[in-house]
């Protein structure tokens, strides 16, 4: 599927259809509205493209920017990089979200996920959406993950959530991968229930948050010093 890149908004993740994004998702707790032009990475393995990689980078960079700006405002904070999320608008998936955070926190060392009641770097939402589950950002530090009810019944819910969270940490989709690869998403089919990243995925996340974050932090510190 050809994906139209957005002017302002990008969506990445596990969508059951190849529909182009319109307004925000039809969630129980309405997710932020998106511009009409946006990109979606579908759940079907054939949906991948070079433009998908650009979409994923946009989401990752938005989250990194949000975290870096907070660190720049408080340089004396602990050395560990922490990405804060809100699960307030996805109460039905609270256990899966918590489990996903635990999985990633036990798998990588350069970044940690933690829930926050305010000032989160991204948020989870839930509801019914023909596009399925996906991650979206406006490219300016505001992002969210949408978890679709039907898709989370058809596929292992913890795997879906951990997969979407992988986009937050910088990983792209790789539908042709085996079940042992978390970012293969729905490629291996509904029988795949593995919610863990493999060694290559773990290594990649550690690299991204060691080098990519430092560059973003340097930029944020420079910007803060000019104020």
UniProtKB/Swiss-Prot annotation:
Which residues would be cut away as propeptide?
30-42
Mind listing the GO biological process terms from this record?
proteolysis
- What family does this chain come from, according to its entry? Belongs to the peptidase M7 family.
Q: Do the record's keywords include Disulfide bond?
A: yes
Annotated binding of Ca(2+), by residue = 156, 158
Cofactor(s) the protein needs: Ca(2+); Zn(2+)
The Enzyme Commission number assigned here is 3.4.24.77
- The gene designation is snpA
Reactions mediated catalytically: Hydrolyzes proteins with a preference for Tyr or Phe in the P1' position. Has no action on amino-acid p-nitroanilides
Detail which positions bind Zn(2+). Answer: 163, 167, 173
Q: What class of enzyme is it?
A: hydrolase
Protein name per Swiss-Prot or TrEMBL: Extracellular small neutral protease
GO CC annotation terms, alphabetical: extracellular region
Alphabetized GO MF terms: metalloendopeptidase activity; zinc ion binding
Q: Where is the active site?
A: 164
Please provide the record's keywords in A-Z order.
Answer: Calcium, Disulfide bond, Hydrolase, Metal-binding, Metalloprotease, Protease, Secreted, Signal, Zinc, Zymogen
**Location within or outside the cell:** Secreted
Q: Does the keyword Signal apply?
A: yes
Q: How is it modified after translation?
A: The N-terminus is blocked.
What SUPFAM superfamilies is this protein classified in? Metalloproteases ('zincins'), catalytic domain (SSF55486)
Cofactor comment: Binds 1 Ca(2+) ion per subunit. Binds 1 zinc ion per subunit.
User: What pairs make up the disulfide bonds?
Assistant: 179-192
Give the signal peptide range.
Answer: 1-29
**Which InterPro entries does the record cross-reference, listed alphabetically?**
MetalloPept_cat_dom_sf, Peptidase_M7
